[in-house]
Every structure is written in structure tokens, then in C-alpha cells.
């Protein structure tokens, strides 16, 4: 049987990937401070994120409706179609994570609860139960043919596999030498390779991702949709998942491709949060103040063109004047020169 052991994460990951964790951790700390200072701005982001998360996670699985209809469902409308019932179930589970994350942990009961919440109105027999028969992960090719992408754990071995997965996760989570942002994607790979349900595995995995991020101290999923990012880059997401599941049954798989993909998605979420925050918080500011705020709030070096893109109503002349003044006042530093020049808050 598959062995679940994450001790390799102590020293088995390339150093350049380890550095990414430090960047993401800094971004997270920065936004925790922002959140206390700009409550209303983050509340607007929260309202937007719940819609995008519900839409994105279900859309990946071909479960769709209009954005307006999703808004109606979130506000209490009665679901009519099969898809709307599944969408509403995901919304309820996601809301539970956002409101009760301090009282939730990744466990067998919580995993089954998420599945039950999603499926009870469309498939009450299977809802909240592990798969009753073996299943395959299929891929539909452009020419209409099918191929088996992965052969998951058998139905009669699922309960034990989930138990061993959870024990390995608990053990690794307590080990201070194991970066939790490496542990989360490894857990997701293993969960999806087990594929414990006949339907809904992908959506449950995304709920677990958001919950595990909360547990690790990252509430990014409350303000920026992780599911939306996965949906927008789902080809690379599934390619990385397939690479990291190759050799899984023989304990020979390499988690690195999926770890890298996960960190890229997380970084994009923080970048989007930074941009969204600027859009909301700078609406009423003077043009020169908006340019300065963009520069001071940037989490990575940005170019003049980047500033123009963020502030299309601000003239190039105004941007250049602010840049020159901030350089003179030593508020920012210049990296590179001429067309490749980028600017960053001075440390």
C-alpha cells in the first residue's frame, strides 16, 4: 500500500523554491497590517472573492451559471437547476470555512462534511460517503477520445488511505523543519490520487486548500479567490498534478512540479490582492498621491509602464514627476536603467 511520509520536505526541495516561501510570508505579513488599517477596502474584496471562488471552483468541473445568478444564490435565492444546487453547496461549505476556520481542522469528519454539504441536494446517497466502487480519473482528448490519466486507490482501501494521509499530515504539521507551504500541495496531490469520492474530489480539494491555508496563518482565500487563479491556469495546474502523481502507487512520485505550481498560484493571489487593494483604496486620492501609494504599496519592483497600467487616467508627466521627487527624497530606489528601470520602496 502507498506510504505517506512527508519527512523528505525537510531537505528534499531545491533552494530556489524555498526562497519563494519567504517572499510569500512577507506579503502575507504586510497584508495582515493592511487589513487592520483598511477594513472597508478588505470587506469589498471579501464580497468579490466569494463570488469568484464559487464560480471558479465549479467552472473547473463544468458546473456553470451566470455571475448574476451566483450573486442571487449567495444572497439567498433558491437553486433551480442541478448545477445551481451544486454551486450553492460549495458556497455553503466555503462560507463555513471563512466563518469557522478557527474551529475546524483537516479531519475525516470535516472532509466528509464538506462533501455532504456540496452533494446532499443532488446526490443524497453518495453525499458525505467515501466511494462505494472503484473509479478512474479520465481525460477527454480534443478528438473526442478518452484516456485514463490516473488509476486511484481502490474503494475498499480508501478509508485506510485517508486515515494514513491524515496521520502523516498531522505529524508533518508539527515538525518545525517542514515548511507548511510545501506540505499543503503534497497533501492535495495525495488526496487527489486517493480520489476518495465518486464525484466532487476536485472541489473538496480546493476547500481543503483554503482551510489548510487558514490553519497555516494565510487568510488570502478570504479576499482573493484561490479557485479563480486555479481555473485561469488550469492547464498548467493539471499538468503539474499529473507530473507529481506519476509513480505515486510505487512511492516514486516527485511532488516538486505541483509544489512549484501551488506557490505560483499563491504568489499570483497576493499580487492580485495588492492590485485590487490599490484600486479600491486610491479611488478618491489625488493623482500624485495615487502614484506614490502605488509605489509605496508595491510588493515587487514595478516599472513606469506598470504604474501607467494601474493608473490609466494619470499622465506620464505626473508619474515621472512623482518618481523623480520620491527618488530625490530617498523614498524609493531605482533598479536598472532606461526602459528596464523598475522602482521599489527603499528599505
Give the ranges of each region predicted by the language model.
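FIC/Doc superfamily catalytic core
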Residues: 1-347
Amino acid at each position: 500500500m502507498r506510504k505517506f511520509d512527508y519527512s523528505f520536505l525537510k531537505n528534499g526541495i531545491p533552494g530556489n523554491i524555498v526562497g519563494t516561501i519567504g517572499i510569500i510570508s512577507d506579503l502575507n505579513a504586510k497584508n495582515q497590517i493592511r487589513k487592520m488599517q483598511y477594513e472597508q477596502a478588505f470587506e469589498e474584496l471579501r464580497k468579490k472573492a466569494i463570488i469568484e471562488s464559487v464560480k471558479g471552483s465549479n467552472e473547473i468541473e463544468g458546473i456553470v451559471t451566470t455571475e448574476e445568478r451566483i450573486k442571487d444564490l449567495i444572497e439567498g435565492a433558491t437553486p433551480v437547476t442541478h448545477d445551481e444546487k451544486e454551486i450553492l453547496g460549495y458556497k455553503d461549505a466555503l462560507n463555513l470555512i471563512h466563518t469557522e476556520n478557527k474551529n475546524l481542522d483537516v479531519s475525516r469528519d470535516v472532509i466528509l462534511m464538506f462533501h455532504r454539504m456540496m452533494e446532499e441536494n443532488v446526490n443524497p446517497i453518495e453525499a458525505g460517503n467515501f466511494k462505494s466502487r472503484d473509479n478512474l480519473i479520465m481525460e477527454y482528448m480534443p478528438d473526442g477520445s478518452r484516456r485514463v490519466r490516473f488509476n486511484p486507490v481502490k474503494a475498499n482501501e480508501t478509508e485506510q488511505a485517508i486515515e494514513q494521509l491524515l496521520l502523516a499530515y498531522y505529524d508533518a504539521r508539527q515538525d518545525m523543519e517542514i515548511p507548511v507551504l510545501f506540505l499543503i500541495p503534497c497533501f492535495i496531490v495525495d488526496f487527489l490520487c486517493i480520489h476518495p469520492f465518486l464525484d466532487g474530489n476536485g472541489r473538496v480539494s480546493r476547500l481543503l486548500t483554503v482551510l489548510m491555508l487558514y490553519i497555516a496563518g494565510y487568510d488570502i482565500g478570504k479576499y482573493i479567490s484561490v479557485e479563480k487563479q486555479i481555473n485561469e491556469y488550469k492547464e498548467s495546474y493539471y499538468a503539474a498534478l499529473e507530473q507529481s502523481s506519476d509513480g505515486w502507487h510505487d512511492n516514486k512520485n516527485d511532488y516538486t512540479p505541483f509544489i512549484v505550481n501551488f506557490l505560483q498560484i499563491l504568489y499570483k493571489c497576493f499580487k492580485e490582492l495588492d492590485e485590487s487593494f490599490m484600486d479600491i483604496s486610491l479611488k478618491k486620492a489625488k493623482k500624485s498621491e495615487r502614484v506614490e501609494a502605488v509605489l509605496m504599496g508595491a510588493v515587487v519592483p514595478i516599472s513606469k509602464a506598470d504604474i501607467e497600467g494601474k493608473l490609466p487616467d494619470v499622465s506620464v508627466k505626473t508619474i515621472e514627476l512623482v518618481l523623480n521627487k520620491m527618488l530625490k527624497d530617498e523614498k524609493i530606489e531605482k533598479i536598472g536603467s532606461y526602459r528596464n528601470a523598475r522602482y521599489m520602496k527603499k528599505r
